[in-house]
């Protein structure tokens, strides 16, 4: 008899869990919002994600978490990696309602967003690369034209029946009543899903949205992998994490410094109004000699100010040249070893950098910007290559840490 009671309790518990899950997957009467993270690689996508999360909250719509878009060498089409591969979903719910795109499409889309009602949103007409598709009498978002646009929506078998141009509305919900305008023009009853061809957010991330980084927490897989690497591969003691951006595409991007007031993530060190100075080439592409000088200076400074927690090693993340040989040679007399992952994994690099005692990143890079925001959440110190300028550093009391 006791066994039967326990069995009934177990069945009731299972039913309760099923009921709870169904309730969580019930439709949101306030509507949904999603987008293709189709601009740039992870750093750019992360900036856009924070802005899109804030935008969804301002409109009071559930954010459908898009997969991350990746471009792999030798593959013609982008890869879509589920959001929760790299980051936990639950912490985001402390800020606002979210659901993964897979859960939405598998459990809710047929009822809430049937195929006959799928509308793509863009600011104004987006022209197709295939000229025959461009009809002056029928302007279109061409939401699936090109890579990664087509592969992204194809991942979930999404096609659009028409386009909606939302100009002159915009995404800055912090300095105007823009959210109310969106809600008035696109009520959830008529537009259950706002599906944007690109992220409804600015780049670089708005200052007001940087604080949302606290809700973006690494998945258990990456938390454990990063801790394992630190424990098994790095010598005991404090370590300095660095990000070197030096691939050929970056070399070309840095050529625009001379003609720009801002470039990519430069506001993270120069300020959104350039209140901490103007752009200069060394911020974007520091020389090998400058990198070594700054590393030695940082290590010596930590030894003087934190003698009980000296830096014992350097961990390098890079898109191209990790400079392992050069750095090992330069730092060997200081008793410092230099390390990298055996195989490239930019996400694991970030998870490891986030646990370093000190970090030096690239002011212009949105990848470094992700790391800077993550470290700010935990109160960890961060610095930038070439900032402040070496000549300014000698004549001012500006502290390197930001």
From Swiss-Prot:
<feature type="disulfide bond">
    <location>
        <begin position="254"/>
        <end position="284"/>
    </location>
</feature>
<comment type="subunit">
    <text>Interacts with N (via its EGF domains); the interaction is required for the endocyctic transport of N.</text>
</comment>
<dbReference type="GO" id="GO:0045747">
    <property type="term" value="P:positive regulation of Notch signaling pathway"/>
</dbReference>
<keyword id="KW-0808">Transferase</keyword>
<keyword id="KW-0914">Notch signaling pathway</keyword>
<dbReference type="GO" id="GO:0036066">
    <property type="term" value="P:protein O-linked fucosylation"/>
</dbReference>
<keyword id="KW-1015">Disulfide bond</keyword>
<dbReference type="GO" id="GO:0005112">
    <property type="term" value="F:Notch binding"/>
</dbReference>
<feature type="disulfide bond">
    <location>
        <begin position="36"/>
        <end position="38"/>
    </location>
</feature>
<feature type="binding site">
    <location>
        <begin position="243"/>
        <end position="245"/>
    </location>
    <ligand>
        <name>substrate</name>
    </ligand>
</feature>
<dbReference type="GO" id="GO:0045807">
    <property type="term" value="P:positive regulation of endocytosis"/>
</dbReference>
<feature type="glycosylation site" description="N-linked (GlcNAc...) asparagine">
    <location>
        <position position="60"/>
    </location>
</feature>
<dbReference type="GO" id="GO:0045165">
    <property type="term" value="P:cell fate commitment"/>
</dbReference>
<comment type="similarity">
    <text>Belongs to the glycosyltransferase 65 family.</text>
</comment>
<feature type="binding site">
    <location>
        <position position="349"/>
    </location>
    <ligand>
        <name>substrate</name>
    </ligand>
</feature>
<keyword id="KW-0256">Endoplasmic reticulum</keyword>
<protein>
    <recommendedName>
        <fullName>GDP-fucose protein O-fucosyltransferase 1</fullName>
        <ecNumber>2.4.1.221</ecNumber>
    </recommendedName>
</protein>
<keyword id="KW-0294">Fucose metabolism</keyword>
<feature type="disulfide bond">
    <location>
        <begin position="122"/>
        <end position="141"/>
    </location>
</feature>
<comment type="pathway">
    <text>Protein modification; protein glycosylation.</text>
</comment>
<feature type="binding site">
    <location>
        <begin position="366"/>
        <end position="367"/>
    </location>
    <ligand>
        <name>substrate</name>
    </ligand>
</feature>
<keyword id="KW-0328">Glycosyltransferase</keyword>
<feature type="signal peptide">
    <location>
        <begin position="1"/>
        <end position="23"/>
    </location>
</feature>
<dbReference type="GO" id="GO:0005788">
    <property type="term" value="C:endoplasmic reticulum lumen"/>
</dbReference>
<dbReference type="Pfam" id="PF10250">
    <property type="entry name" value="O-FucT"/>
</dbReference>
<keyword id="KW-0119">Carbohydrate metabolism</keyword>
<dbReference type="InterPro" id="IPR019378">
    <property type="entry name" value="GDP-Fuc_O-FucTrfase"/>
</dbReference>
<keyword id="KW-0732">Signal</keyword>
<dbReference type="GO" id="GO:0006004">
    <property type="term" value="P:fucose metabolic process"/>
</dbReference>
<dbReference type="GO" id="GO:0046922">
    <property type="term" value="F:peptide-O-fucosyltransferase activity"/>
</dbReference>
<dbReference type="GO" id="GO:0007219">
    <property type="term" value="P:Notch signaling pathway"/>
</dbReference>
<keyword id="KW-0325">Glycoprotein</keyword>
<comment type="function">
    <text>Catalyzes the reaction that attaches fucose through an O-glycosidic linkage to a conserved serine or threonine residue found in the consensus sequence C2-X(4,5)-[S/T]-C3 of EGF domains, where C2 and C3 are the second and third conserved cysteines. Specifically uses GDP-fucose as donor substrate and proper disulfide pairing of the substrate EGF domains is required for fucose transfer. Plays a crucial role in Notch signaling.</text>
</comment>
<feature type="disulfide bond">
    <location>
        <begin position="269"/>
        <end position="363"/>
    </location>
</feature>
<feature type="binding site">
    <location>
        <begin position="41"/>
        <end position="44"/>
    </location>
    <ligand>
        <name>substrate</name>
    </ligand>
</feature>
<dbReference type="InterPro" id="IPR039922">
    <property type="entry name" value="POFUT1"/>
</dbReference>
């Amino acid at each position: 008899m006791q066994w039967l009671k326990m069995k009934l309790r177990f069945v009731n518990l299972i039913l309760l869990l099923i009921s709870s899950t169904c309730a969580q997957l019930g439709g949101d009467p306030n509507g949904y919002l999603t987008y293709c993270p189709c601009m740039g690689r992870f750093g750019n996508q992360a900036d856009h994600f924070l802005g899109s999360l804030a935008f969804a909250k301002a409109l009071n719509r559930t954010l459908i978490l898009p997969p991350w878009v990746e471009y792999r060498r030798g593959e013609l089409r982008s890869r879509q990696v589920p959001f929760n591969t790299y980051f936990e979903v639950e912490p985001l719910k402390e800020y606002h309602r979210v659901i993964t795109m897979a859960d939405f499409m598998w459990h809710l889309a047929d009822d809430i967003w049937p195929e006959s009602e799928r509308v793509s949103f863009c600011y104004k007409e987006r022209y197709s690369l295939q000229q025959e598709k461009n009809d002056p009498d029928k302007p279109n978002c061409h939401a699936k034209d090109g890579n990664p646009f087509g592969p992204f929506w194809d991942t979930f078998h999404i096609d659009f029946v028409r386009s909606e141009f939302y100009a002159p509305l915009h995404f800055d919900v912090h300095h105007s009543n823009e959210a109310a305008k969106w809600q008035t023009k696109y009520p959830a009853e008529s537009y259950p899903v706002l599906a944007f061809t690109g992220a409804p957010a600015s780049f670089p991330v708005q200052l007001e949205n940087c604080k949302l980084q606290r809700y973006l927490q690494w998945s258990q897989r990456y938390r454990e992998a990063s801790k394992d690497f630190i424990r098994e591969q790095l010598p005991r003691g404090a370590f300095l994490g660095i990000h070197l951006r030096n691939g050929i595409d970056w070399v070309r991007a840095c050529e625009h410094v001379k003609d720009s007031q801002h470039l990519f993530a430069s506001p993270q060190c120069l300020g959104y109004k350039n209140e901490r100075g103007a752009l200069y080439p060394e911020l974007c592409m520091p020389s090998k000699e400058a990198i070594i000088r700054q590393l030695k200076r940082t290590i010596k400074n930590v030894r003087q100010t934190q003698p009980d927690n000296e830096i014992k090693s350097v961990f390098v993340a890079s898109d191209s040249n990790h400079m392992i040989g050069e750095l090992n040679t330069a730092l060997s007399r200081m008793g410092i070893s230099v390390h990298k992952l055996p195989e490239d994994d930019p996400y694991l690099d970030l998870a490891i950098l986030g646990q370093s005692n000190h970090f030096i990143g690239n002011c212009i890079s949105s990848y470094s910007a992700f790391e800077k925001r993550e470290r700010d959440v935990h109160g960890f110190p961060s610095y930038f290559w070439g900032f402040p300028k070496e000549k300014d550093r000698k004549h001012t009391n500006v502290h390197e840490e930001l």
